[in-house]
Amino acid sequence: KIEDVGDKLRSAGDKISGVGQKLLPVTAAVTGLGTAAVKTTADFDTAMSQVQATMGITKDAMSDLNGESVNTVEALRALAKQMGAETAFSASECADAMNYLALAGYDTQKIYDTLPIVLNLAAAGSIDLASASDMVTDAMSALGMKTGEAGTMVDQMSKTASTTNTSVSQLGEAILTIGATAKTIKGGTAELNTALGILANNGIKGAEGGTHLRNVILALQSPTDKAAACMEKLGVETYDSEGNMRSLNDILGDLNTGMDGMTSAEKQNIIASIFNKTDLAAVNSLLANTGDTWDSLQQSITESGGAAQQM
């Protein structure tokens, strides 16, 4: 009987031991989750500390945010966590994006307003946050845009990328290459994206597309004496009666009309008289898409509200 009791005790011990072994993976998983959570919190705190250092503020610093005086650090931490919960990016990544904006000299209000735009651009274009931040801040600076306008531009870039043969990243490169020259375009960023989309459909994209479009605009704005005489003869005017640049579609459309009935050789001679020879392929691509084709694409890009979030 004593031996039977001993056998039963050993059996019970083996079962308890087996339960313990089965619980080990569960315990390890729970411990792992705890460790990951601690690391995530530590990463977030480190990222926010970097934002604080870049902005040169103390933990007690106050800022005016949407008309209210708030603790700067607490407000930015709350924003990073909110964006981390609402987007595909973690709170730490959102804090990193904040730091890129702080490096560009943005204050609390501008960071608060611009961060969602940067995150939308990064997600829509599948690009890293550093590049997205640079694109937004550089474009706002070059084109003299306000935050709301930057949000519209990102939507337009996303719409252009989804309807023409280019990407958000390539459009960003093109826009930054054109820079302040694009300020004078009548149709703003919608017309800019339309022209870049047309060029992209013809294999001219990225910085290359931006360079050619910039050259085309400059050639129309400041023509040589020979080019000016040629344009006048054809009835092509770059500026309206008030001295503002007309739309590219209208200018190039008038050039097409002026060359109507000419041979291909005659047309190319005229185009070469007005534009740089290195830009002729781009000019011909734009000329081939004036009128309704241009208007239709530009309208779809203009009506692109929320396109970045949809992508």
Predicted feature descriptions by range:
Residues 4, 8-11, 149, 170, ...:
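Juxtamembrane loop-helix boundary motifs flanking transmembrane segments in multi-pass membrane proteins
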Residues 2-5, 9, 65, 267, ...:
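Extended hydrophobic/Leu-rich segments
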Residues 3-27:
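Membrane-penetrating hydrophobic segments
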Residues 87:
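N-terminal glycine-rich anion-binding loops that anchor highly charged ligand groups
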Residues 42, 127, 166, 218, ...:
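Flexible, active-site-adjacent loop/turn segments at secondary-structure boundaries
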Residues 81, 239, 246, 250-311:
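Hydrophobic, often aromatic-rich secondary-structure segments at membrane interfaces
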Residues 25-84, 93-104, 111-124, 131-163, ...:
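Small-residue helix-packing and pore-constriction motifs in hydrophobic alpha-helices
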